[in-house]
Amino acid sequence: MPKIREIIAGKKCVIYADEQPQVLLIQPVGEHEDATLDAEIEAIKGTVNVPFVFTGFAISDWEEELTPWYDPNISPRQSVGDHAFDTLGFITEQLLPYIFERYGKLPVVLGGYSLAGLFARWAVCKEECFDAVAAASPSLWIVAWKDFSDAHEVYARYVYLSLGDREEITKNKAIAQVGNNIRWEYDHLQRTIGLDHCTLVWEQGGHFVTPHLRLARAFAWCINSLTKSRF
């Protein structure tokens, strides 16, 4: 699968593309994730038989660019929570038109790990252009997540959630809520978008165990769900 590095609207991007792709995957990528992207793509390809195009775009400030609202447990910086809409705007106004022009209009999966997973899950309540969300170990422990989720419709057709089975075992009281919150979220999604349109996978270990493989499994589930629903 060819790998292309490009600058799109000032952001560093990496594109992996099969011929005649049927699905577009989008992922915010931090510096710590760049080294494992090749392995992530190989893991996806080893799971699905559907051609796809993957586009990752660089995130330079993980907290600033991905956190949807202020939470001092994420960062004490007051600016954190003000710029997720800027990131979402880059995707909808710059990245998607660019990719669609090159590869055609495709079903879109927005995915991410940790704060990027939170961002992806939040984004599908703000824009209707995403068909599925791949939220691996999303930071759903953010303050007021349940209130937000309960008040906002999910526009995506499919939602994948996962969490390590030891992630909620922590002395950090804020992060310790992630298990209860993701269980609540899964129940909420079953009621709102349907049992066949969402899943919650419990991975082994803590938060930092093979994130790229967890995310690959998330993307693969979304690809399979979207392509099956088209036939």
Language model features: what each stretch is:
Residues 1-23, 52, 56, 198:
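A domain-start/cap signature at the N-terminus of enzymes
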Residues 107-112, 136:
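Short beta-strand immediately N-terminal to the catalytic nucleophile in serine-hydrolase-like folds
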Residues 214-231:
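Catalytic active-site module of serine/aspartate enzymes centered on a nucleophile-bearing elbow/loop
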Residues 140-214, 222:
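The feature captures the conserved acid-bearing segment of alpha/beta-hydrolase catalytic domains
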Residues 111-116, 120:
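Gly/Ala-rich beta-loop-alpha elbow adjacent to hydrolase catalytic centers
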Residues 122-132:
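Conserved hydrolase catalytic core segment
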Residues 26-30, 137, 163:
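The conserved beta1-alpha1 loop
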Residues 19-102:
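Serine-hydrolase catalytic machinery in alpha/beta-hydrolase-like enzymes
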